[in-house]
Every structure is written in structure tokens, then in C-alpha cells.
Amino acid sequence: MAVRMSCMVDKVPGSTLLASKILGHVLLSQNFDVKVSEVHGMSQRGGSVVTYVRYGEKVYSPVIDKGEADAIVAFEKLEAARWISYLKKGGQIIVNTQEVEPMPVITGAAEYPQELVSKMEAAGANVDAKDFLAIAEEAGSAKAVNIALMGRLSKYFPEIPEHAWEEAIDAIVAEKFRALNHKAFELGRNA
């Protein structure tokens, strides 16, 4: 069995951790060997938080090298573009179309790059770009954007039954937030 990899990118504090916990739980429930690692790039000052998730029959390291990731899940377009060098040719990017302006844009020193989705596609990526923030808000809370993205990611794992994702939400999310997260997952999956 080949090792599959996912690189998850985030600008929303805490979201990557929950999303990677859900993904890790799902993969473990399917008897994969799973390795997870987080890299914090001064997120409190506008840097990325990246979680690497690798899985397969046997995985020795969570680190994903450039050109090796099968998928990137990004909470913001510029973050997806920043990490595209880690995606293998023909890899999948699932990206929230939200634009979070980095400090150089906020201060007027730079402009937010345009046409990011088409540039990622031109670089050889398969891009699934949707307004997952609006999807999360439709579910009941913008904070559920991570689960909406996980719902969409689940479509790219046809070998993993949908109930495994639902069970992961039940196992990890506090009971009072489960209904909201299940709704966000379903809306994201079917977006």
C-alpha cells in the first residue's frame, strides 16, 4: 500500500488541530499507521500553522517533503498558494475562498495576489475552491469551517466510509457542538 499524505494549512487558530485530529482519528479507525506533526510559523504574527498527516501501511515520519503531498487542505487561498510546492503534480487542493490579508497587505506594503486559484491550477494542481466559511455559517457557526473542509476532504477518500468521519466527530467534538459539526460536515461534503 502506498503512503498517502495530506498537508493541512491554516490561518485560523485552533482549526488545524481539530481538523487534523478528525483526520487522524478517521485514518486510525481504518487501521492505517498514522503520523501527525504540527509546525507553527509565528501564527500570532500572521504566520502559518501547518499540520502534516501521513498514513499508510507503515509510516516512519510525519514530515512531508516538497512535491510529496497528495492533498493540501487550506483555510485561505494565499496559504494554499504558499504551500503548493509541497503538492505532487496532479495533487488535490481543497481551499476555502476566504481572503485573510497578511500584514504586508494590511500595512499597504503589498497587494493581495489575484487569480490565485487559476495560478494553482496552472501549476498542475486540481483545485476544489469553495466558500467554506459561508458553508460553516449556514451550518450555524463560522467556527465550523474546519469541519466543512473535512467534509469536502472526505469526498476524496472514497475508500473510507462516511460513517467513519461521523464517528470521529462524535469521538472528538464536545456533545453540545456535535449537531452543528455534523451539519457542517454534511454541507461541506455535498458542496
Placement of each model-derived feature along the sequence:
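Active-site cofactor/cluster-binding pocket
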Residues: 1-191
